[in-house]
């Protein structure tokens, strides 16, 4: 389906990058790999209307994935990646390399659009690096609001 063809597959890579660090078990709780739109809906609570109107690869879906993961995992921080890593699946409107990353920290959710170039592996790797950077920024900004 649409989600399977278009999913960037960055979620598993992101979880792997995090748990490769010693001591990660003290901060990393769970991960969701939701290639199919049905999984995005069932596991993360992404609305059917969001997927129909904006598609799996969109700011709106990235935000709903992040806030849904936050709620499902009862976590303090959640991050989502949805995009088109290629080599196919891209369109003129949504080309290969288009990635949306969402971050939710204690109920405050943002999403950002990225456009990466290169092969599938490079796009996925860049998406994971961008997700870690965005998550760090999201945590720091959220913490500074509390002071």
Residue spans for each PLM region:
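Short alpha-helical segments enriched in small residues
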Residues: 1-147
């Amino acid at each position: 389906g649409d989600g399977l063809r278009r999913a960037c597959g960055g979620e598993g890579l992101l979880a792997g990058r995090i748990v490769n660090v010693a001591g990660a078990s003290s901060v990393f709780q769970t991960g969701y790999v939701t290639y199919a739109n049905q999984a995005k809906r069932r596991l993360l609570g992404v609305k059917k209307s969001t997927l129909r109107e904006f598609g799996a690869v969109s700011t709106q879906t990235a935000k709903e994935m992040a806030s849904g993961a936050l709620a499902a995992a009862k976590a303090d921080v959640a991050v989502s990646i949805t995009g088109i890593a290629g080599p196919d699946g891209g369109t003129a409107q949504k080309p290969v390399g288009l990635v949306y990353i969402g971050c939710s920290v204690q109920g405050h959710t943002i999403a950002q659009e990225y456009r990466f170039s290169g092969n599938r592996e490079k796009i996925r790797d860049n998406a994971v690096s961008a997700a870690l950077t965005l998550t760090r920024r999201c945590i720091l900004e959220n913490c500074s609001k509390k002071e």
